[in-house]
């Protein structure tokens, strides 16, 4: 599972085979073959790929988004486009573009990069004309303000995850009540504060399994105090115990 994150690129995930769970702020989408997930600019999102899943991931940089509008940061497209067998459906046309891009990427013939770029613009055209969403300026400004505060909190967690952080620490960082902080964090990340903190710790722990330090030392280093709960979540995410993962990657 990828950690919740954000970027200025427009990100699209097209599922070729298998299943995937996608999270965008407080929305959850269960994707299957032919479905498309779209993470809008600067919105917090993450995905969980199930075993055996194949997918295409495309990130479209701001330079291309500016061709749609100078105010590209406010662009919002439909996040989830479900696969449809109906002739001429949006999902079918977008899927054909992704398959074409995949073919061109693998062929790597002369001029294929230009053809690939033309497919990106064809995709953007379909999104702009058939999947664009409009939000009121007042609501958008409020969302942007709150979203920036939550991003600052996530960066704070990344910097201090090894410490014994609590919900009260997160609320104090934003100078709000714990109740308001809970609602705000859940709204923009789709996770609880403690759930996200646990994921950050688990990710750093997993990365260090390739080293030689004892597992008990890694647990302590990354602020993990309840091993029983951690082990359950680790097996849910990676399908194995830390010891099994270490043997596999050693």
Residue ranges and their predicted role:
Residues 101, 157-160, 208-209:
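Short helix-to-turn junction characteristic of helix-turn-helix DNA-binding domains
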Residues 38-107, 124-136:
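A hydrophobic/aromatic-rich effector-binding and dimerization subdomain
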Residues 1-32, 36, 49-51, 69-78, ...:
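Generic protein-terminus/edge-of-domain signal
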Residues 21, 164, 212-213:
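Residue at a beta-strand N-cap/secondary-structure junction
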Residues 3, 111-113, 246:
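N-terminal hydrophobic signal/anchor transmembrane helix of membrane proteins
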Residues 79-90, 105-116, 124-155, 159, ...:
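Short, Lys/Arg-enriched, Trp-marked, Pro/Gly-tolerant hinge/linker segments that flank
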Residues 158, 164-202, 219-248:
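Basic/polar phosphate-binding segments, predominantly the helix-turn-helix DNA-binding elements
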């Amino acid at each position: 599972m990828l950690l919740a994150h954000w970027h200025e690129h427009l990100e699209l995930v097209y599922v070729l085979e298998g299943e995937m769970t996608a999270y965008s702020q407080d929305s959850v989408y269960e994707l299957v073959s032919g479905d498309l997930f779209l993470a809008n600019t600067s919105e917090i999102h993450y995905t969980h790929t199930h075993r055996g899943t194949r997918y295409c991931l495309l990130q479209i940089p701001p330079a291309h988004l500016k061709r749609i509008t100078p105010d590209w940061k406010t662009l919002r497209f439909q996040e989830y486009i479900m696969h449809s067998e109906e002739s001429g459906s949006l999902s079918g046309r977008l899927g054909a573009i992704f398959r074409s891009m995949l073919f061109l990427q693998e062929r790597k013939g002369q001029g294929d990069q230009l053809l690939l770029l033309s497919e990106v613009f064809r995709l953007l055209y379909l999104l702009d004309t058939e999947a664009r969403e409009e939000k009121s300026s007042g609501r958008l400004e409020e969302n942007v303000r709150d979203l920036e505060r939550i991003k600052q909190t996530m960066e704070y967690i990344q910097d201090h995850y090894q410490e014994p952080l609590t919900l009260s620490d997160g609320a104090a960082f934003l100078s709000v009540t714990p109740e308001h902080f809970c609602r705000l964090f859940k709204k923009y990340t789709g996770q609880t504060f403690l759930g996200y903190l646990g994921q950050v710790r688990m990710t750093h722990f997993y990365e260090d399994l390739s080293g030689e330090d004892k597992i008990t030392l890694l647990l302590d280093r990354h602020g993990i105090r309840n091993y029983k709960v951690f082990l359950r979540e680790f097996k849910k995410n990676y399908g194995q115990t830390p010891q099994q993962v270490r043997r596999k990657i050693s």
